[in-house]
A protein has these predicted regions:
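Edge beta-strands of jelly-roll/beta-sandwich modules across compartments, strongly enriched
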Residues: 289-297
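Short beta-strand-plus-loop segments that form exposed binding edges in beta-rich domains
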Residues: 282-289
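Juxtamembrane "anchor/assembly" segments of surface/extracellular structural proteins
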Residues: 1-86, 91-276, 291, 402-403, ...
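Charged- and aromatic-enriched interaction segments used to assemble
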Residues: 77, 112-176, 220, 302-407
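Hydrophobic residues embedded in beta-strands of well-ordered beta-sheets
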Residues: 100-102, 280, 390-393
Length: 646
């Protein structure tokens, strides 16, 4: 007998080989679902007669829905010893009895089946239970801040000009200016306000256009063109008052009382260095009543600001993976997750930042599903899961397609059929992250959005989506941190999961963002290259992580567009560069080969190549799926992903 079947009931083993009715339906399959690891599965329905029929019927009658039994299937090896092929529990909720045969299904309690059933479930975790005491020292991005003022005058009909009434006075007065717009998300640098026409001597230290709250250098732009009536004298001065009360005139325009009607300009466009407490305003003085016509005024102050550093709770990818697997397993231990290290430095130096942790919310939570984790690992790093009996290991896809020939069928095959898998042919590739909308103009600097490429292939309209569900946008994290202290929630981003490129620093046990200064790549084309982070998670790096897979269907990716800042250059390589893929890098081709073989032994190494000879050519391919019938000597059916034809 080639196979053997046993029933396990109440700790006893019963030989039921002769009682298995559908013996020729007993199969084991190998399947590579999404160009990742090969998963084994087995038959899920059994039919029993005679002694096995009586045994199962008795168990069901005695224990009803608490009935329990398992089936074990063996095959004989070349040494005439029995090898267990699989075992599974029987599901008595599928119990069927026709009077002579009992039909009952197996409970597919394999890890692969468990993950398949729960992979889309989003779980909620308290971040403090995942951090393992790890913190990110977040010192922010240097951001551009600005304030713009307008002249607080009277509008002139059918004109963009404004008029200002000047009253004769012995004392100087503030020139009337009001805040028009501002971009000041980071406080503690500049306080700004309006000035209205009153005596400067009455205003004191609390009346100013802007005041420095710390030592700082800003860029001040002042350009006020004004039409002064003939023979009217006027002086206008941009003034800086020091914290010690000393006055400095930055620029001054003086018009005497002997001139025709003329346009004059008060202009200042320079860096201005301020000490804490210094403040500025514009004043005027005149002994005449007059009406000034102001044309195209521009008053603006720009400076760079950075948040006060904060600590953010962070989570390692492997910790999140294991917590997801525990949830999938009903909260029980017993399933472990591993992530291969030493393959991609970007992954080795990757830490997860829950949005609520960035916000600094009390009892911050992380929201994630197994599917999102898998999609992130695949799109960002080219890593895919290999599911075993009680362990899930994430490895780079390339490692699952070995160049070693593990089985040579020669020409001992039949039912040969080669075809092109059109589902693997893409005309476009989209890589990156979902576009985010920010309230700040600084957000225009962000480049962690979606890049789109064309492949030059017009045979299909398929699009390969390498879109990460986790976010890497530096400004997204920055704006969340800036919201610390706010009680309101942000439904648009509080449930998001971010990740950062960070290194552990031994001096204080905290993680630091990787930037150019501490080993990160050089970057240009952004507002602050020195403080920008996550450069290695740009969409182009995602393409590089998956380049051998992409090479299956194209040799060139032509950059088409970007949702974000495409002027970024990282380590001297423009983000919008076209990407060349050589034929030698190709992981496999779009061809598939279906064959049958009388060789009943499955390859030991499911990552290696199977070779087949046909018509004077040798085909090399990887297992996509294989079906083995252990109940009878039937040819094994293979579908191979063709690697090459020689």
């Amino acid at each position: 007998m080639y196979y053997k079947c046993e029933l396990l009931v109440d700790g006893y083993s019963y030989q039921v080989t002769d009682n298995l009715v559908n013996w020729d339906d007993i199969t084991t399959s190998f399947k590579r679902g999404d160009y990742d690891g090969v998963v084994r599965s087995f038959s899920t329905k059994f039919e029993f007669s005679n002694a096995a029929y009586s045994l199962l019927k008795r168990v069901f009658r005695e224990k009803y829905l608490q009935a329990s039994a398992s089936v074990v299937f063996y095959t004989r090896n070349n040494s005439w010893l029995w090898n267990e092929r699989f075992r599974c529990s029987l599901d008595f909720s599928t119990f069927q009895d026709n009077g002579s045969t009992i039909s009952i299904s197996a409970v597919d309690d394999s890890l692969a089946a468990l993950i398949k059933a729960k992979k889309g479930t989003q779980y909620e975790y308290v971040v403090s239970e995942l951090t393992e005491g790890k913190y990110l020292y977040y010192d922010g991005i240097e951001m551009n801040q600005n304030v713009n003022w307008l002249v607080a005058g009277n509008s002139i009909e059918d004109s963009t000009d404004v008029s200002v009434e000047i009253q004769a006075a012995l004392k100087s007065k503030y020139f009337p200016l009001a805040v028009k717009s501002s971009e000041t998300s980071i406080g503690g640098y500049i306080t700004y306000g309006d000035t209205f026409q009153q005596n400067v001597s009455d205003g004191g230290k609390d009346t100013f256009l802007f005041r420095a709250e710390r030592n700082i250098t800003c860029f001040l732009s002042v350009s006020i063109s004004f039409n002064v009536p003939a023979n009217k004298a006027l002086s206008m001065t941009l003034v800086k008052i020091g914290a010690d009360g000393n006055e400095a005139e930055l620029t001054r325009t003086v018009i005497n009382d002997e001139h025709p009607e003329t346009i004059f300009i008060l202009s200042y466009m320079k860096d201005i260095t301020l000490l804490e407490g210094d403040y500025c305003f514009i004043r005027y003085g005149s002994a005449y009543n007059m009406t000034l016509t102001i044309r195209d005024p521009y008053i603006s102050l720009n400076w760079d600001a950075r948040i006060i550093p904060v600590n953010i709770d962070i989570v390692t990818p492997v910790k999140l993976l294991n917590r997801l697997l525990q949830s999938i397993n009903g909260g029980q231990e017993g399933i472990t997750g591993e992530i291969a290290s030493g393959v991609d430095k970007r992954l080795d130096e990757c830490m997860i930042v829950p949005a609520e942790s960035a916000r600094g919310l009390k009892n911050a939570k992380l929201y994630c599903s197994y599917t999102k984790f898998v999609d992130w690992m695949n799109a960002e790093f080219g890593f895919v899961p290999v599911i075993g009996e009680d362990k899930v290991t994430f490895v780079h896809r390339n490692s699952l397609f070995s160049k070693n020939v593990v089985k040579d069928f020669g020409d001992n095959i039949r039912s040969f059929e080669y075809n092109v898998n059109s589902a693997l042919i893409y005309s476009r590739v989209r890589a990156g992250y979902d576009k985010q909308d920010y309230d700040s103009v600084n957000g225009r600097d962000e480049f962690h959005f979606t890049n789109e490429y064309t492949t030059g292939v017009t045979l299909t309209e398929n699009t390969l989506e390498l879109i990460s569900p986790f976010r890497a946008d530096a400004y997204g994290i920055e704006f969340l941190v800036q919201k610390r202290g706010e009680d309101t929630t942000d439904s648009d981003s509080d449930n998001d999961v971010f990740f950062v490129n960070a290194k552990l620093v031994s001096i204080d046990g905290r993680y630091r963002l990787v930037r150019t200064i501490n080993g990160g790549p050089s970057i240009s084309g952004v507002i602050s290259p020195d403080t920008m982070f996550n450069a290695v998670y740009s969409p182009r790096y995602m393409i590089e992580a998956n380049r051998r897979f992409i090479g299956a269907f194209t040799n060139m990716l032509d950059f088409a567009s970007s949702d974000g800042n495409s002027d970024v250059v990282i380590d001297g390589v423009p983000e919008k560069i076209d990407i060349q893929l050589s034929e030698g890098e190709r992981l496999f081709t779009v061809g598939e080969l279906s064959v049958e073989s009388g060789d009943m032994k499955a390859p030991e190494d499911l990552t290696g190549l199977i070779s087949i000879e046909k018509g004077g050519e040798t085909y090399y391919g990887y297992i996509k799926d294989g079906k083995f019938n252990y109940g009878r000597a039937e040819a094994v059916k293979y579908t191979l992903i063709v690697e090459s034809i020689k």
